[in-house]
From Swiss-Prot:
GO terms for cellular component: cytosol. HAMAP family: PyrC_classII. Zn(2+) 1 binds at H13, H15, K98, D246. Disulfide bonds: none annotated. Substrate binds at H15, L16, R17, N41, H135, L218, H250, A262. This is Dihydroorotase. Transmembrane segments: none annotated. Pfam families: Amidohydro_1 (PF01979). Belongs to the metallo-dependent hydrolases superfamily. DHOase family. Class II DHOase subfamily. Homodimer. The keyword Hydrolase applies.
Amino acid sequence: MTTLTITRPDDWHVHLRDGEVLKDTVRDISRYNGRALIMPNTVPPVTNTEMALAYRDRILKEQHGEQFEPLMALYLTDNTTPEEIRAAKATGKIVAAKLYPAGATTNSDSGVTDAKNIYHVLEAMEEVGMLLLVHGEVTHHHVDIFDREKEFLDTVLAPIVNDFPNLKIVLEHITTADAAQFVNNASDNVAATITAHHLLFNRNHMLVGGIKPHFYCLPILKRNTHQQALIEAATSGSKKFFLGTDSAPHAKGAKESACGCAGSYTAHAALELYAEVFEKEGKLENLEAFASFNGPDFYGIARNADTVTLEKSAWDVPESMPFGNDIVVPIRANEQIEWKVK
């Protein structure tokens, strides 16, 4: 196969940051996506409706594709109120709220300290039909970083799923076979996003032959058996899994340092990277559902009406890309990607 035409995709989990870098991050995400769900862990975090709408306006000023629509999310804190959830839902532009366990990832210090603290908020979300997005890691110091997702499933997510059976929940950027199994075994109200980099790489890519800081992300890359479980889930055709890049840019110097930031940048070539994975598995026929159908279907939003075409045409990824007044090193820098969006 040399070309593949699919319904225009969406990215259900992306970080655009804010300020001067938006012109670059929005350029990449709006190039062929119909919609993207914008993560709210900016500085300061997007904790209320007014902030979310203002952030949306800043994004729209930089968009490059007329078809592109940013979908917004609120950042949940211990102080979020049910009234804020209702106000956000009423806008029609804020489609979800994000649970970051405090300290779990970049700019998450204002996150939720205990899920029980927001049960009254989850009740309001269940009532109005707002989705809950979850960064699925515990932050207890005694839990090994490679075990944080599994521990979260058992101690935090399972009780939420049980206590709020009508709440739609997306377990974001899953990284383990345990998470894939949890989602498969849960009700149809539980789904998951999977990143391109967790499908393409495992912890050996990050650690063998020297530390590769641009592979460092949270949740951290796991062993190859977990990687294979993610590949099987993503390419299976199951409606429970869909595209969410978790593309998370940091300036080159913030990654290549003694205490580097977590996040991998894939928005420059996300669909192309996923296409490589699906082709290698002999499952290209399932890429459209993963990239273009399952996400909007789960969110209760119409699928995009137009299409994009991928062609089998290798191209060179640049060594770096503009990032405001700095540069970002994209995944597969100085290497080739086999597919290209026409």
